[in-house]
Amino acid sequence: KILGERVDASFATSLKKTIIAADKEIHGVFDLIMNDYGPGRHIASVHIEVPDTWTADRIDRVTRKITNAVYEQHGVAMAAVGVYSINTKNDVAAKIHAQVSKLVLAHEGVMQIHGFFVDEETKQMRFDVMVAFGTKRKEIYKDVIAEIQQAFPDYNVQAQLDSDISD
C-alpha cells in the first residue's frame, strides 16, 4: 500500500452519505482526510456545512451522532468533525455567495468552493477554494483572491487553498 494514497472513491462517497444523513440541515461534507493504520484501523476527519443558526448544543449532538454512525457503519473512528457555518439569515450574503462562486469557478483548475461565509458586521468573507493537482495551484489561488478582492473591495477576503484529497 502506498503512503498518502487517495481514499477509495466509493468508500469516501459512502462515508459522506452516512455523514450527511445524520441531519437534514447539513448542507455539505468536505475535506475528508482518512488515515489508514492497517485493516480495521482507520481514523478520519471531515468538515460539515451547517446553518449559522445552529447552537453549540445542536452541533455537539450532531457531531456525536456522526461519529457513532461512521464507526458503526464503516468501522472508521472520527478524530474530528469540523464545522463551517453558512449564511442562512442574510439575503445579501446569499447574493454575494452566488457572485463569488461564479467568479471562482470560472477559473480553470478550480474544482470547488465551500465553507463560504460573509460577516457583514466585520466585512469579512471566508471560504475554501479547491484547486486540482497538476495545475499551477498557487498561481490560480492568487488570481482567484485578487479577482474576488477587486470585485468586493470593501471586504477582507480570507480564502484557504484546499487540496483534492478525496472524492
List PLM regions with ranges:
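Alpha-helical transmembrane segments and adjacent TM-loop junctions that form the membrane-embedded core
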Residues: K1-D167
